[in-house]
Amino acid sequence: MSSSASQAPSPTKIRRVRKLRPKLTKIYAMLKIGGDLSLAEHLTVERIDFGEFGNSRPFRIRITNLFNGNSDYYYVKHADASRLFGLELEHILSPNRINYLVNGNTLIEEHIAGVPGDVFIRDHLPNPSINHVRIAKEFVKFGERCFLRLLGDMRTVNYVVDITPDFEEVQYRVRPIDFDQQSYEGNLQVYRAHLFPDNRPVEDLVREHLNDQTILQYRAEEHLQMSRRAKVERNRLKAVLTVMNRTEVAPQENLLGLREALVERYGSHAFEACETMGALTATHLQQVLNLTPARR
């Protein structure tokens, strides 16, 4: 991202930014503490960055606590349908909680902490002391989570790796950070994270350290966990999928392509009646969470 401080601002721009800063602080207070501004008087906007990559081209706001210098971030993005449904499905079906706000066409997302995927593969993966088996296991589970709920484009720039020291080993959790390809593409391969070339190093780890039976075991574990989460949040999930079914998420040609691919993959006619991406997503969840995992 490029920083707004990299160029000398004009006096007019300075006045606009000064006027904008308290509003940005208020948004942070709404996102994090429910809008109680009395608890946000010591917060300030330290920096505004502009994302020059990706479809969302977000603004990243850095909020700093004047008492202790601690900083946090949030993002301002365009609230398109795929991204909103992706956030909801991530919150409901994954082990991760998501915090965001929507107002009209504006989406406010909290920062998801972790090492960017490309940085993790470049700087952490070559470390001989790292537990490659645990990494391979987590990437299998991550890929399965994305595929089951049809979240696509999980290239290395679109996820982070959360590294947590445990009492004996280190735990790894892979988390998506961009959800604009939720149930959007017509090519089924886009939803299979391990097929992207920049994920090849971790896919090689999977093939090196996990046999087919173990891969199926980890995928079945993820199926069970997602099924349990879906049951706990059944009302919310039903509401999201109902709205998704009424929304034009993707072009018609994408719908037809994905529908044909799913029919071919599972040999099931249940997908043929689906007229929206929302219906395809709901049917895929229903079908797969009650099926023995198919081989990769």
Regions found by a protein language model. Name each.
Residues 8-118:
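Conserved ATP-binding subdomain of kinase catalytic cores across diverse folds
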Residues 10-18, 84, 145-155, 201-205, ...:
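Short secondary-structure transition/capping segments
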Residues 92-94, 105-110, 142, 204-213:
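Short C-terminal domain-edge/linker segments immediately following a structured domain
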Residues 102-105, 127-128, 136-138, 202-207:
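Short, surface-exposed, polar/charged, turn-prone segments marking secondary-structure boundaries
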Residues 119-126:
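AlphaC helix of the protein kinase catalytic domain
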Residues 127-189:
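Conserved kinase catalytic-core segment
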Residues 168-296:
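C-terminal catalytic region of ATP-dependent kinase domains
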